[in-house]
Swiss-Prot record:
<dbReference type="InterPro" id="IPR002171">
    <property type="entry name" value="Ribosomal_uL2"/>
</dbReference>
<dbReference type="InterPro" id="IPR022671">
    <property type="entry name" value="Ribosomal_uL2_CS"/>
</dbReference>
<keyword id="KW-0687">Ribonucleoprotein</keyword>
<dbReference type="Pfam" id="PF03947">
    <property type="entry name" value="Ribosomal_L2_C"/>
</dbReference>
<keyword id="KW-0694">RNA-binding</keyword>
<dbReference type="GO" id="GO:0015934">
    <property type="term" value="C:large ribosomal subunit"/>
</dbReference>
<comment type="similarity">
    <text>Belongs to the universal ribosomal protein uL2 family.</text>
</comment>
<dbReference type="GO" id="GO:0016740">
    <property type="term" value="F:transferase activity"/>
</dbReference>
<comment type="subunit">
    <text>Part of the 50S ribosomal subunit. Forms a bridge to the 30S subunit in the 70S ribosome.</text>
</comment>
<protein>
    <recommendedName>
        <fullName>Large ribosomal subunit protein uL2</fullName>
    </recommendedName>
</protein>
<dbReference type="InterPro" id="IPR022669">
    <property type="entry name" value="Ribosomal_uL2_C"/>
</dbReference>
<dbReference type="InterPro" id="IPR014722">
    <property type="entry name" value="Rib_uL2_dom2"/>
</dbReference>
<feature type="compositionally biased region" description="Basic and acidic residues">
    <location>
        <begin position="229"/>
        <end position="239"/>
    </location>
</feature>
<dbReference type="InterPro" id="IPR008991">
    <property type="entry name" value="Translation_prot_SH3-like_sf"/>
</dbReference>
<dbReference type="InterPro" id="IPR005880">
    <property type="entry name" value="Ribosomal_uL2_bac/org-type"/>
</dbReference>
<dbReference type="InterPro" id="IPR022666">
    <property type="entry name" value="Ribosomal_uL2_RNA-bd_dom"/>
</dbReference>
<dbReference type="Pfam" id="PF00181">
    <property type="entry name" value="Ribosomal_L2"/>
</dbReference>
Length: 274
């Protein structure tokens, strides 16, 4: 890994900071693990915008990543580490002893030629997946399940991880990167180590066009709109909101908690730190 600041040959290049990964695969991805990805620009079947600030961007296929890691007892060899345009983390192409190939989230320090294993008997090593009941307290984990057998849902982005704090008879307590402490069933699976590409936050795009390549459209301030478009809109000249900051649909937008899932509220031991 190397952080490179390019020469300021133009205003768009002046602020660019690249993170160069020389170990990534230079060729094409595994064709059997690709799926077409239809771009809908944040619109639903009626053509209405349901997700703002999405549209355009470079075409790419979806890489089918194995988040369940359910091939127990079968060792897999890492063939290569690849870039994935759909996520911030790198992915690893592994080949199991029975010949099947799968993509997994590459943990930090995983190298080509290494062997990984899944199951309750797997050793405590980066890249191995075990039930939480078999992981020592204090271990660093990623790709953690919330429901046993559903697949990893927590700590999947670049550089993230969770820490196993305690383990009870049925549930274990883990601390997330946000500071939240959560109870998770001990039969849920997790992968040892932290996610790769921890230098992702060092990258500087340098110009708006680089963000457009990723399919992100501009975010317009409400005070710059007309009254028909936003509650903050209108006025003669430059004006403030004149009220509590709200969203385009007139719900409070700063400090207003939007969590409504009461069913899983009991699994949160302490809320995240602001």
């Amino acid at each position: 890994m190397a952080v490179v600041k390019v020469k300021p040959t133009s205003p768009g290049r002046r602020a660019v900071v690249k993170v160069v990964h020389s170990h990534l695969h230079k060729g094409k991805p595994e064709a059997s693990l690709l799926e077409p990805q239809i771009q809908n620009a944040g619109r639903n079947n009626n053509g209405h915008i349901t997700i703002r600030h999405k549209g355009g961007g470079h075409k790419h296929h979806y890489r089918v990543v194995d988040f369940k890691r359910n091939k127990d007892g079968i060792p897999a060899k890492v063939e290569r580490i690849e870039y994935d345009p759909n996520r911030t983390a790198h992915i690893a192409l592994v080949c199991y002893a029975d010949g099947e190939r799968r993509y997994i989230i590459a943990p930090r320090g995983l190298e080509v030629g290494a062997t990984i294993l899944s199951g309750s008997e797997a050793p405590i090593k980066a890249g191995n997946t075990l039930p939480i009941r078999n992981i020592p307290v204090g271990s660093t984990m990623h790709c953690v399940e919330l429901l046993a057998g559903k697949g990893a849902q927590i700590a999947r982005s670049a550089g993230t991880s969770v820490t196993l704090l305690a383990r009870e008879s049925t549930y274990a307590q883990v601390r997330l990167r946000s500071g939240e402490v959560r109870r998770i069933h001990i039969e849920c699976r997790a992968t040892i180590g932290e996610v790769s590409n921890e230098e992702h936050n060092l990258r500087q795009y340098g110009k708006a066009g680089a963000i457009r390549w990723k399919g992100v459209r501009p975010t317009v301030r409400g005070v710059a709109m007309n009254p028909v478009d936003h509650p903050h809109g209108g006025g003669e000249g430059r004006t403030g909101e004149g009220q509590v900051p709200v969203s385009p649909w007139n719900t409070m937008t700063k400090g207003y908690r939007t969590r409504s899932n009461k069913r899983t509220q009991t699994f949160i031991v302490s809320r995240r730190k602001k």
